[in-house]
């Protein structure tokens, strides 16, 4: 059977201030007055029925997710004792689904992307499901790049495989290149953006975890033996303490020989940075601004105003300004991808850590 797994435990730190620890990005209402999480569930429902839609998150967000997704069975919401990156949360979800269904196929979706082109999106995932079953492959969805983007990973397309879609073996992955490399990838035309969406059988991904992450696999199998038992939560917590967290890209996808990519013919945006989010603000004389902003003689600025005060920009350029009420961020636009390092430093400063 086909199951959707929605990854909803991240904190969205690159959108700091708009996305906070207590209100991360997946709960933001940016596009249509619905949260990214709700849009993700509604988008996949025509392909996968609600009973087969699962969400994995951490304990801090459990009640918030139950409130957002009141029509999703609470038993379908998995929680992790701590964040150990995507390979771990996918592995944990895989053993839980495999326990109930030996033929489980997982459609893994981030909870915080914006997608337009519903039919093409569902058709692409349907083709990925077919390849995952027929070839026992690990399939990811690639997006045709429209600009030299340094905030995304890239996938080089290899040999095309017989399929109704544009499906290829993966030649290699490149994680977030610099601007010159990104420009070169765009010109070559053989590279796709890595969307972070995956399709695979639960048993296949677990075999690949066993092969490339044997220590993690051992912990997952120990948890598997206790699923449904009284001590499941305790064992999960203990085994998570032994796991070295790693992303599914670094841990499995860049190593496996079972990797395929399908080119998705739909509009996709990972609104994971202020530069990305500014594409959805109002255009004003080569600037992007929200409500409660007045600017004059400014160039290439993105200004996110709050509800209680007016932000005035005068004679500045290449800035991101964010008003979150208790914190105001002023940042050079070129630092967009470096904000995680800044937040780590602030978090280690006792008098400021509470603002993260």
Which residues make up each language-model segment?
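Conserved core of the sugar-phosphate nucleotidyltransferase
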Residues: 118-230, 234-237, 260, 308, ...
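Short beta-strand segments
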Residues: 6-8, 56, 107-110, 140-144, ...
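Residue-level signal for inorganic ion chemistry
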Residues: 27, 37, 93, 112, ...
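Conserved N-terminal catalytic core of the sugar/cofactor nucleotidyltransferase
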Residues: 2-6, 14-21, 29-110, 116-126, ...
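Short histidine/acidic/glycine/proline-rich micro-motifs that form metal-
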Residues: 113-115, 145, 268
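A short acidic, often aromatic-flanked loop/helix-cap motif at beta-alpha or helix-coil junctions
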Residues: 83-88, 147-149, 179-181, 268-269
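Left-handed beta-helix
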Residues: 203-204, 209-356
């Amino acid at each position: 059977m086909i199951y959707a797994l929605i990854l909803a435990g991240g904190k969205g730190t690159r959108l700091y201030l708009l996305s906070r620890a207590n209100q991360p990005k997946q709960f933001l209402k940016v596009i249509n007055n619905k949260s990214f999480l709700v849009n993700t569930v509604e988008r996949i429902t025509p392909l996968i029925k609600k009973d087969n839609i699962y969400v994995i998150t951490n304990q801090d967000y459990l009640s918030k997710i139950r409130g957002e997704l009141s029509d999703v069975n609470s038993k379908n919401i998995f929680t992790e004792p701590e964040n150990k990156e995507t390979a771990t949360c996918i592995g944990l979800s895989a053993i839980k689904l495999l326990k109930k269904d030996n033929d489980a196929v997982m459609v893994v979706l981030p909870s915080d992307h914006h997608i337009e082109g519903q039919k093409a999106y569902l058709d692409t995932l349907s083709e990925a499901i077919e390849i995952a079953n027929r070839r026992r492959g690990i399939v990811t969805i690639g997006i045709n790049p429209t600009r030299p983007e340094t905030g995304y990973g890239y996938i080089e397309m290899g040999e095309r495989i017989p399929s109704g879609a544009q499906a290829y073996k993966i030649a290699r992955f490149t994680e977030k290149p610099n601007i010159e490399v990104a420009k070169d990838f765009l010109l070559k035309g053989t590279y796709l953006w890595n969307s972070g969406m995956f399709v695979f059988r639960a048993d296949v991904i677990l075999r690949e975890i066993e092969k490339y992450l044997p220590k993690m696999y051992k912990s997952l199998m120990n948890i598997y033996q206790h699923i449904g038992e009284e001590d499941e939560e305790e064992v999960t917590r203990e085994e998570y303490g032994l796991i070295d967290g790693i992303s599914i890209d670094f841990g499995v996808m860049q190593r496996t020989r079972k990797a395929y990519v399908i080119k998705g013919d739909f509009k996709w945006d990972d609104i994971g940075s202020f530069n990305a989010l500014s594409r959805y603000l109002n255009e004003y004389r080569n600037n992007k601004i929200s409500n409660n902003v007045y600017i004059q003689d400014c160039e290439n600025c993105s200004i996110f105003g709050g509800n209680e005060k007016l932000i005035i920009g005068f004679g500045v350029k290449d800035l991101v300004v964010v008003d979150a009420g208790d914190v105001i961020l002023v940042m050079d636009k070129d630092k967009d991808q470096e904000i995680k390092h800044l937040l780590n430093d602030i978090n280690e400063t006792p008098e400021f850590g509470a603002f993260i």
